[in-house]
């Protein structure tokens, strides 16, 4: 009996390695497609995961490995670029041509490129026709505002900086200080960087009489011409037109404060409107284009791609990477992602039902200008813009000091950067 049991156990042990090897072999046969994205909200990530799972069902030989590094994304990608070991697919977050261009596969032969929104051509294509990335959505940044407050005080959505300042003063006066006219989440310096970057375009680009494009490109721009934006921001702070805790306020506070009708304007877009509506459906959040600064100029959207999928040109799974992009570009899938991010699709054949759809339709004839830093500033200047904004609000630097610092950093970063934002028209 004992002999029989030992023999049986031996047979089991002989069979198990075979089963294990068979399973291991099946797993090994699957190709892993690694994807890195800058998506930040749960709704965005959940929808992306859902679509990735659907792709896996159609491609049983492929496993999709999604990664959302958050604030570590850029540093992680810099390390991987230095090692020439990029993910199979990755998010170019506005730097498809400038920073990642030499690493990306050309997608021009893919079917969806026929429906690429022309507003994205200057950002995602070069003169020879190379397409650097697939735009999951596109940004149209302006000013988010509380419709209830503007209606209550009889204020029309401002179209110029002068009108904007007047609106802020009216809100402060009529609310007796109970409402923050213009709210910043300055604990995250990107809040101030967004202000500078967004208003730099109407200040220095769109008005023909004040066009500094050539000077910004060739490095001769006089940064004293940038001082206006710091002066206006400081003026707003002195008049208490922005929140007194602008340097320490966090983004996590925004939704609740807006839902309580305590904020009139902010520069946060994305899912803000729908997030506020979930807390307080009676609060109506809208979005308007960035006001003009110079007399006679028009408001503009500041935009470009928000989330993208670029394929690493040296990826051993390049075919599979393109298959995934083609899957994401199907109209039904592209619509899902656009709606999850509450932004328009990057494709003209996709009409998404997003929160700000009526606003975008109302302002459909307003021109979209690319993000200022992506075209005219060297890599690294975004962080500098955010830092000087914090220093201005904390009374560490005066407006003129900020312009001098920006000039020094602009020169330094141009010299150390191999490619400049202004030199991306290859």
UniProtKB/Swiss-Prot annotation:
This protein's major location comes to membrane
Q: What superkingdom does the record give?
A: Bacteria
Compartments where located: Cell membrane
- Regulation: induction: Repressed by the transcriptional regulator MelR. Induced by melibiose and raffinose.
Instruction: Report the gene knockout effect.
Output: Deletion of the gene abolishes induction in the presence of melibiose and raffinose.
Q: Which SUPFAM superfamilies is this protein grouped with?
A: Periplasmic binding protein-like II
Signal sequence range? 1-18
Q: How does it sit in the membrane?
A: Lipid-anchor
Look up the coiled coil feature and give its residue ranges.
none
- GO biological process terms on file: polysaccharide transport
Per the record, lipidation of type S-diacylglycerol cysteine is found at 19
**At which residues does the record annotate a lipid attachment of kind N-palmitoyl cysteine?**
19
Q: Enumerate the UniProt keywords alphabetically.
A: Cell membrane, Lipoprotein, Membrane, Palmitate, Polysaccharide transport, Signal, Sugar transport, Transport
Recorded GO cellular component terms are: plasma membrane
Q: Which Pfam families match?
A: SBP_bac_1
> What is the role of the protein in this entry?
Part of the ABC transporter complex MelEDC-MsmX involved in melibiose, raffinose and stachyose import. Binds melibiose, raffinose and stachyose.
* Description of how the protein assembles with itself and partners: The complex is composed of two ATP-binding proteins (MsmX), two transmembrane proteins (MelC and MelD) and a solute-binding protein (MelE).
Q: What does the sequence similarity comment in the record state about its family?
A: Belongs to the bacterial solute-binding protein 1 family.
Name of the molecule in the record: Melibiose/raffinose/stachyose-binding protein MelE
Organism encoding this protein: Bacillus subtilis (strain 168)
**Which taxonomic lineage is given here?**
Bacteria, Bacillati, Bacillota, Bacilli, Bacillales
Q: Which gene encodes it?
A: melE
